């Protein structure tokens, strides 16, 4: 029934801009300091996963726009391009990285180290999606873009994830499926988004295995406060929850 969305909109509707009369506003300064960063305005661009649904180049386009405006961009864990490309597109504007904490601690550590290496100024941990919700519209439409290889570029570009693929390779008979047009189109979509040659990804089955591996480790409903010291050990960056 989307009651949560309605409640969120109602909460924002209750916010009011309070006018202040007879104040000198001939010179206005909207700058603010956040996490040691001097920002020209109190704005950050929030992470949005699978932006390629809007446009194939959307992730980098948003990063370039953020860079041009000097607005920090929290780039998504579920982006369709690696974080390094998004950070490069931002120029001198500082990026932040959204972290979905997966079942693999080694992968979490690798993501954090990559984010730090490409200039991220903070790790923003998403806590409300340790398990996907019961999304009735998505269920009615059989809608999960991850199954088409969308939005998993942080994973397929990561050496730890690639190592997991090698360690957890399925026997040939385990990946057989009935051949249908939808199945062929799904496999092609996965292969086109997998790094390297589309044909090689199809022949090796690696693109399909990557999607299977992602689905198996993405959710981590066991995450608790007790896990946070591990993250603190991986980085000196600020951690936002």
Regions from the PLM with identified roles:
Residues 1-36, 142-151, 156-218, 222-223:
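An N-cap/entry alpha-helix motif that binds or orients negatively charged groups
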Residues 1-131:
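N-terminal capping/small domains of soluble enzymes
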Residues 46-48, 96-97, 212-214, 236-238:
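A short, structure-level motif marking secondary-structure boundaries and short turns
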Residues 51-52, 101, 217-218, 239-240:
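A generic secondary-structure micro-motif detector
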Residues 77, 102, 218-225:
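Conserved phosphate-coordination/catalytic loops
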Residues 135:
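Active-site region of glycoside hydrolase catalytic domains
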Residues 138-140:
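Charged mid-protein connector segments
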Residues 223-239:
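Conserved, well-ordered alpha-helix/loop/beta-strand core segments that scaffold catalytic motifs
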